């Protein structure tokens, strides 16, 4: 009986600690999307959205989302990338 009481106490303590770990605010340590290489220019009609990479990334970049839900990395300094971003912002 004493063993089962101890086991129950350990189980409850473990559950309490796990609950606190999993209740951390979303985004506290979430991974960031970074670009390690850039894609060539892709047709504008395939692009539906974009977001900029985090400032924590080693290379700045833009990630375009395609109609097929793929992510394409692009160099934010390139002219075509800036044109696509402007077009997406105007048509949002």
From Swiss-Prot:
Gene3D superfamilies: 2.40.50.40. GO terms for biological process: astrocyte cell migration; calcium ion transport; calcium-mediated signaling; cell activation; cell-cell signaling; chemotaxis; cytoskeleton organization; eosinophil chemotaxis. Expressed in lung, spleen, and pancreas. Its main location: secreted. It is found in: Secreted. GO terms for molecular function: chemoattractant activity; chemokine activity; kinase activity; phospholipase activator activity; protein kinase activity. Self-associates. Also heterodimer of MIP-1-alpha(4-69) and MIP-1-beta(3-69). Interacts with CCR1. Belongs to the intercrine beta (chemokine CC) family. This is C-C motif chemokine 3. The lineage of its organism: Eukaryota, Metazoa, Chordata, Craniata, Vertebrata.
């Amino acid at each position: 009986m004493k063993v089962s009481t101890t086991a129950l106490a350990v189980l409850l303590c473990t559950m309490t600690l796990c609950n606190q770990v999993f209740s951390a605010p979303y985004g506290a340590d979430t991974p960031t999307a970074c670009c390690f290489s850039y894609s060539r220019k892709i047709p504008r009609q395939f692009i539906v959205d974009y977001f900029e990479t985090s400032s924590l990334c080693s290379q700045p970049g833009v990630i375009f989302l395609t109609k097929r839900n793929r992510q394409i990395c692009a160099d934010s300094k390139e002219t075509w990338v800036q044109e696509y971003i402007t077009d997406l912002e105007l048509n949002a």
